[in-house]
Regions:
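Conserved beta-loop-beta connector loops within the AMP-binding
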Residues: 1-19, 55, 117-120, 156
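Hydrophobic alpha-helical segments, especially N-terminal targeting/anchoring helices
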Residues: 3-4, 12, 47, 53, ...
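Conserved ATP/PPi-binding loop(s) of AMP-dependent carboxylate-activating enzymes
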Residues: 6-38, 76
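A short acidic/small-residue loop/turn micro-motif
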Residues: 17, 67, 162-165
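AMP-binding/adenylate-forming catalytic core of the ANL superfamily
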Residues: 22, 27-28, 50-135, 146
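AMP-binding/adenylate-forming catalytic domain of the ANL superfamily
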Residues: 132-154
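Phosphopantetheine-dependent thiolation modules in NRPS/PKS and related acyl-activating systems
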Residues: 154-173
């Protein structure tokens, strides 16, 4: 099922967190007492995925709950912004994440790897036709090398985000 922040099941078409249960679903993680909140008393498991179910009953997973940026009360899915960036000419890889913002809580930031020089202002302008203004990255960092990866081959979002936050903090001082 798909639930809202209060744990209430949502009607078809509405996005929320995906819960699953069944005989093949685990009931706890081995040696991970910190994960107790992922398992509900009635057998439901919180997947951490943002999803919706359409009117025909098909399930669509659209993002990860941990990869949501909350900017001034607006929820922004990193994958949506990454997809928009990937459509820009010369961008090979994109990684989107939140960075701390005193006023809004978080601000949208991105690190990109491209095969040619990218004009950040032109990139931000072009994103206006694909994304709402509040979803457009305020901070864009250009990497001269392919983006860092973890052992599974996925982009190492945590380390890229940490580096960018450190750079931004350095610029503030």
């Amino acid at each position: 099922g798909v639930v809202d922040d209060g744990g209430n099941f949502l009607p078809s078409g509405e996005r929320g967190e995906l819960l699953i249960r069944g005989t093949s679903v685990i009931h706890k993680y081995w040696e991970r007492p910190d994960s107790i909140d992922d398992f509900l008393e009635d057998g439901w498991f919180r997947t951490g995925d943002i999803a919706y179910i359409d009117k025909e009953g098909f399930l669509y997973v659209v993002d990860r709950l941990k990869q949501i940026i909350i900017r001034g009360g607006e929820n922004i899915g990193c994958s949506e912004v990454e997809s928009a960036l990937a459509g820009y000419p010369s961008i090979i890889e994109a990684c989107v994440y939140g960075v701390p913002d005193e006023r809004l809580g978080e601000e949208v930031a991105a690190t990109i790897y491209a095969d040619n020089q990218v004009d950040v202002a032109a990139l931000q302008e072009s994103l206006k036709s694909k994304l709402a203004n509040f979803k457009i990255p305020k901070y864009v960092r250009i990497s001269e090398t392919p983006l860092a990866r973890i052992a599974s081959g996925k982009i190492d979002k945590k380390s890229i985000q940490k580096e960018h936050v450190l750079e931004l903090d350095t610029k503030k001082t």
